C-alpha cells in the first residue's frame, strides 16, 4: 500500500516507479534491527506473533540477509518484550550483516542446515596480543560446548573468557557454507592469526555510502540490477537490456563510488579499466589490452566493466592527432557492439568532460543512458554529511542541517574534505596535551575528543567548493557595519540578492522570478566594491569576483570562452554572486572599439549579453557590476532583465561621513576630545576613500609619535635607571592634534565637474524612469480598495523597488 502511495505520489512516471521498486518492500519477513538484551552471538529474538507469521518455532535455525549481500545463520528465540516488526541482535551479528540499528533485514527459514564435520577457525591478531596458554581450551571449547551454535563461513565472532575477549573468524566450514557446530564437529585452529587490516576492507561500498544522488541511483539500479539479476524481465517484454551507462558530472561528485557500490551490491564481477593504463607504446598492444578486459568480463558474467576517465581513451577522432587513440576508439566501438546482448556484461563509463568523447560512443546500443551526477542540493548535502559523520564522534551542538545550508556548490568530495578538516581542527586543539614521542596516547585524551560545531565553522571558513578552486574567492570579511551610510542602497541590495536566496518560496508564491542584476555607478572611492563584498558575505552565497581586463586574452575566441567558463562555474555553484569590477572595461558600447584585436571587446560583450539572458531561472546567479563610467556602457546591458537595478552611489552626506569615520576607527583607540561630527561637517565633498585616507594618516602620525616616545624613554632609562621607575605609562591613542595635522594633507579625489556628470546621468535615468509617476487606476468603488490587501502585497513583491529606488535617487542627488 505504501508503495502505491509512493508511486502515485511521484507523478506515476516510470522512473519514479523505479524509485518505488527500489524502496524496501513491506513483507512479513522484513524486520527492523534492534539492540539485543541478552548478549549472545548466535541468538536473535523475535516477538511470538512475528515467529508465527514466519512459521518459525522456538530454536529454529534461520538465515538472515543483511546489506552488501551479507547473510548469516542464527537461532531464533521468542521474546514477549520485543516489539513487532523488530528483531533483536547483538553487535557481532550486526557487524556480520553490515547493518546498524534501525536498518531493515530479511529473515528466511533455513531447514537444510547440517551438523558440521569440520570447521576451521582462526583468531584476529590484535585481539590475542599477550594472551598466553591454549586459546582453543580457554576460549573456543567452552564457547561451542555451551550450545549448538550455527556458524557461517566468513563470519567474525567475539568470545569472552577470563580477563578479555578475543575475536575469531570462521575460515572454512564443511559440508556447506553454513553448519551447526555440534559436540562431535572437529574444530581446527592451526595457522597464522588473521591480520585486522585484511579484515577491514575499505572497498566495501554499498548503496548506503552514496548520498545526494537518489534519483540518479534509481536510474542506475534499474539499468544495472534488473538486467543482471532478472534478465527474464526484458526477455518477456521482448527488448534488449541496456548495455552501457555514461556517468558524467563535476569531479568529486561520486561517479566512481556509485560504480563500486553497484558492483558490490549486485555481487557482479567488477572490472575497472583506468583510461591511461591500457595505453602502450607497441602497436596493437593497447587494443589487445582492451579486448582482454572485455573477454575477462564475459567469462566472469554477470559482470560490470567500469571505464574511469573515459575521455582519455575515447576522444573525438577528428580532433586527435595520434593514430593510437583512433584505433582504441574504434576498438571500443566494435567491442561494445559485439557484446552479445545476453552476455550480462554492462559497461559503465565515467567522465567529467562528456563533450570530449567521440559521438559514436554516445548512441543507443553503446552508452544508452547518460546520467548527470550533478552538484547535490541541500537535502543531498545533508545525506552526504550524515554518511561522512556516521563514524565520527560529534559533540551535541553540531548542526549538520546548518552546515548543509552553508555549503552551496560543494560536491561529495568537498564535504568529505570538510569533515576531515573539522576533525583535524579538533585534534589541533588537543595538540598541547598530546606528546608525539609517546608510543601510545592516553585513553582519556582520546575519549575526550569530539568534533564540535565551532570546528565545523572553522573548517567552513578554510574550505571552498572545488569547482571554484581556480576562480577562488575569499568570501570577504566585510559586513554591513563596515559600510557607513548608504541605508537605502543596503536595503535595495538585500531585497535583490538576499531575499531570493533566503525566501525563494515567496517569489514562487507571487509568480515572479527575482531580478538578476545590479549596476552600481558613482564617483570612485564611494564604496561600490565594498558593497558587493558585503552582500557576498551577508547572504552566504558563493562569490566570484571578475576583474574586467582579466577576461581579455590575445588569442582569438579565448576571451569569450573565459566568459562562458565563468558563468558555467557560477551556475554549478549556485547560489552565486558574480561581481564584475570595472565593468566599463569589457562592456563599452559596441562599434566604437577600433583597432583592438578584431573587436574582442565587442565579442566579449555579446557573450555576456547572451549568458545573462540564458541564465536559467532555476539557478540563483546574481550579477553585480560596478563602474564609474556609466555613460559609456552599452545600453543593451542596462535593460531590465539584465542589469535592471541601476543604483547611484553618491558621495556620502554628512551623516554618512560620520558613519564612515566611525567604521574606519572602530578598532583604533581614539582620544575623548576628537569630535568626529566636526570632522564630518568639515569634509564636505570627500569620498569614502578620502575619509579612510584621513584616518590612516592620523593613525600614522600617532604611531610615529608613540615610537619616538619609546626611543626617548629607552635613552633616558639608559642614562639614569633609577629615575625612570615611577614614571607612569602614557596611554597610546589618536589625539585631536593628529587629525588636525592629517587634515592639512587631506584632498578631494572627485571634482565638482565629475559630480555634475554623474548627476546628469542619474537625472536622465530618473526622467526616463519616472514616466508613469502620475499613473493611478481609475477610481474603483471604495469596497474594493478595502478588499485589496492581496493586490497591494503583490505590488509589494515588485513595485517598491521602483519607488524606493526612485526615492533613494532623489535623496542622493541633492544630498
From Swiss-Prot:
Q: Which GO terms describe its biological process?
A: cell division; positive regulation of protein catabolic process; protein transport
Cellular component GO terms held in the UniProt record: cytoskeleton; cytosol; Golgi apparatus; nucleolus; nucleoplasm; phragmoplast
Origin: domain of life: Eukaryota
Major localization class: nucleus
Per UniProt, subcellular location reads as: Nucleus; Cytoplasm, Cytoskeleton, Phragmoplast
Instruction: State the residue spans of region: Disordered.
Output: 772-815
- In this UniProt entry, the residues modified to Phosphoserine are 42, 720
Q: Does the keyword Protein transport apply?
A: yes
Q: Where is the composition biased (Low complexity)?
A: 780-798
Database matches in SUPFAM superfamilies: ADC-like, Cdc48 domain 2-like, P-loop containing nucleoside triphosphate hydrolases
* Gene3D superfamilies in alphabetical order: 1.10.8.60, 2.40.40.20, 3.10.330.10, 6.10.20.150, P-loop containing nucleotide triphosphate hydrolases
- Which residues does this entry mark as bearing N-acetylalanine? 2
Record: residues binding ATP: 249-256, 522-529
Q: Which GO terms describe its molecular function?
A: ATP binding; ATP hydrolysis activity
Q: Which InterPro entries match?
A: AAA+_ATPase, AAA_ATPase_CDC48, AAA_ATPase_domain, AAA_lid_3, Asp_de-COase-like_dom_sf, ATPase_AAA_core, ATPase_AAA_CS, Cdc48_dom2
The cross-references to NCBIfam families, in alphabetical order and at most eight, read: CDC48
Q: What does this protein do?
A: Probably functions in cell division and growth processes. Interacts with certain SNAREs as part of specialized membrane fusion events where vesicles from the same organelle fuse (homotypic fusion).
- Protein family (similarity comment): Belongs to the AAA ATPase family.
Protein's name according to its UniProt entry = Cell division control protein 48 homolog D
Amino acid at each position: 500500500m505504501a508503495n502505491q502511495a509512493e508511486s502515485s505520489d511521484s507523478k506515476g512516471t516510470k522512473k519514479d516507479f523505479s524509485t518505488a521498486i527500489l524502496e524496501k518492500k513491506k513483507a512479513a519477513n522484513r524486520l527492523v534491527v534492534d539492540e539485543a538484551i541478552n548478549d549472545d552471538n548466535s541468538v536473535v529474538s523475535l516477538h511470538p506473533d512475528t515467529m508465527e507469521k514466519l512459521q518459525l518455532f522456538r530454536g529454529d535455525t534461520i538465515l538472515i540477509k543483511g546489506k552488501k549481500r551479507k547473510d548469516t545463520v542464527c537461532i531464533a528465540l521468542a521474546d514477549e518484550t520485543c516489539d513487532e516488526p523488530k528483531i533483536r541482535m547483538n553487535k557481532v551479528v550486526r557487524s556480520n550483516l553490515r547493518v546498524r540499528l534501525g536498518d531493515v533485514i530479511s529473515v528466511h527459514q533455513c531447514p537444510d542446515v547440517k551438523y558440521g564435520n569440520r570447521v576451521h577457525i582462526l583468531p584476529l591478531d590484535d585481539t590475542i596480543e599477550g594472551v598466553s596458554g591454549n586459546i582453543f581450551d580457554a576460549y573456543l571449547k567452552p564457547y561451542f560446548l555451551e550450545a549448538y551454535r550455527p556458524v557461517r563461513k566468513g563470519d567474525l565472532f567475539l568470545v569472552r573468557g577470563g580477563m578479555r575477549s578475543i575475536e575469531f573468524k570462521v575460515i572454512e566450514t564443511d559440508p556447506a557454507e553454513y553448519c551447526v557446530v555440534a559436540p562431535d564437529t572437529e574444530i581446527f585452529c592451526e595457522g597464522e592469526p588473521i591480520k585486522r587490516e585484511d579484515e577491514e576492507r575499505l572497498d566495501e561500498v554499498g548503496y548506503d555510502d552514496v548520498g545526494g544522488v537518489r534519483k540518479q541511483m534509481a536510474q542506475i539500479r534499474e539499468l544495472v540490477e534488473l538486467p543482471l539479476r532478472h534478465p527474464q524481465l526484458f526477455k518477456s517484454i521482448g527488448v534488449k537490456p541496456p548495455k552501457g551507462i555514461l556517468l558524467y558530472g563535476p569531479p568529486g561528485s561520486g561517479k566512481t563510488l556509485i560504480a563500486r557500490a553497484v558492483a558490490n551490491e549486485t555481487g557482479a564481477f567488477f572490472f575497472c579499466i583506468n583510461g591511461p593504463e591500457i595505453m602502450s607504446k607497441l602497436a596493437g598492444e593497447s587494443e589487445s589490452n582492451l579486448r582482454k578486459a572485455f573477454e575477462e568480463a564475459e567469462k566472469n558474467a554477470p559482470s560490470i566493466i567500469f571505464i574511469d576517465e573515459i575521455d582519455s581513451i575515447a576522444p573525438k577522432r577528428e580532433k586527435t592527432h595520434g593514430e593510437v587513440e583512433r584505433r582504441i576508439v574504434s576498438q571500443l566501438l566494435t567491442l561494445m557492439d559485439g557484446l552479445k546482448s545476453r552476455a550480462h556484461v554492462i559497461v559503465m563509463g565515467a567522465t567529467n568532460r562528456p563533450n570530449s568523447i567521440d559521438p559514436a560512443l554516445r548512441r543507443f546500443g553503446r552508452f544508452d543512458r547518460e546520467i548527470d551526477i550533478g552538484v547535490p542540493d541541500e537535502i543531498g548535502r545533508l545525506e552526504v554529511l550524515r554518511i561522512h559523520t556516521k563514524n565520527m564522534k560529534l559533540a551535541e551542538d553540531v548542526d549538520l542541517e546548518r552546515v548543509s545550508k552553508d555549503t552551496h556548490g560543494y560536491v561529495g568530495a568537498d564535504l568529505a574534505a570538510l569533515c576531515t578538516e573539522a576533525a583535524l581542527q579538533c585534534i589541533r586543539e588537543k595538540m598541547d596535551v598530546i606528546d608525539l614521542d609517546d608510543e601510545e596516547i592516553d585513553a582519556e585524551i582520546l575519549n575526550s575528543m569530539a568534533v564540535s560545531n565551532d570546528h565545523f565553522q572553522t573548517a567552513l571558513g578554510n574550505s571552498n567548493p572545488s569547482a571554484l578552486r581556480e576562480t577562488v574567492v575569499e568570501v570577504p570579511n566585510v559586513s554591513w557595519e563596515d559600510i557607513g551610510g548608504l541605508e537605502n542602497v543596503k536595503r535595495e541590495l538585500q531585497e535583490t540578492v538576499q531575499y531570493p536566496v533566503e525566501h525563494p518560496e515567496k517569489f514562487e508564491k507571487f509568480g515572479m522570478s527575482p531580478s538578476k542584476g545590479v549596476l552600481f555607478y558613482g564617483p570612485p572611492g564611494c564604496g561600490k566594491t565594498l558593497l558587493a563584498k558585503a552582500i557576498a558575505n551577508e547572504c552566504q552565497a558563493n562569490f566570484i569576483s571578475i576583474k574586467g581586463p582579466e577576461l581579455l586574452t590575445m588569442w582569438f575566441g579565448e576571451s569569450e570562452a573565459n566568459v562562458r567558463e565563468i558563468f558555467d562555474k557560477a551556475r554549478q555553484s549556485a547560489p552565486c554572486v558574480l561581481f564584475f569590477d570595472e565593468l566599463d572595461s569589457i562592456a563599452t558600447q559596441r562599434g566604437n572599439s577600433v583597432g583592438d584585436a578584431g573587436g574582442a571587446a565587442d565579442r566579449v560583450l555579446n557573450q555576456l549579453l547572451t549568458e545573462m539572458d540564458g541564465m536559467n531561472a532555476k539557478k540563483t546567479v546574481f550579477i553585480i557590476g560596478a563602474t564609474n563610467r556609466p555613460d559609456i556602457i552599452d545600453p543593451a546591458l542596462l535593460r531590465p532583465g539584465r542589469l535592471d537595478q541601476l543604483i547611484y552611489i553618491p558621495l556620502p552626506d554628512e551623516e554618512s561621513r560620520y558613519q564612515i569615520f566611525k567604521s574606519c576607527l572602530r578598532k583604533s583607540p581614539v582620544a575623548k576630545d576628537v569630535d568626529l561630527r566636526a570632522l564630518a561637517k568639515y569634509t564636505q565633498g570627500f569620498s569614502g576613500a578620502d575619509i579612510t585616507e584621513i584616518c590612516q594618516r592620523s593613525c600614522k602620525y600617532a604611531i610615529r609619535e608613540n615610537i619616538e616616545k619609546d626611543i626617548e624613554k629607552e635613552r633616558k632609562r639608559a642614562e639614569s635607571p633609577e629615575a625612570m621607575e615611577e614614571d607612569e605609562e602614557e596611554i597610546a591613542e589618536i589625539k585631536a592634534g593628529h587629525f588636525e595635522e592629517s587634515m592639512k594633507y587631506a584632498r578631494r579625489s572627485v571634482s565638482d565637474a565629475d559630480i555634475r556628470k554623474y548627476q546628469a546621468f542619474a537625472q536622465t535615468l530618473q526622467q526616463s524612469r519616472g514616466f508613469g509617476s502620475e499613473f493611478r487606476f481609475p477610481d474603483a468603488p471604495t469596497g474594493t480598495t478595502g478588499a485589496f490587501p492581496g493586490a497591494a502585497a503583490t505590488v509589494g513583491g515588485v513595485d517598491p523597488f521602483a519607488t524606493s529606488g526612485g526615492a533613494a535617487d532623489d535623496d542622493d542627488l541633492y544630498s
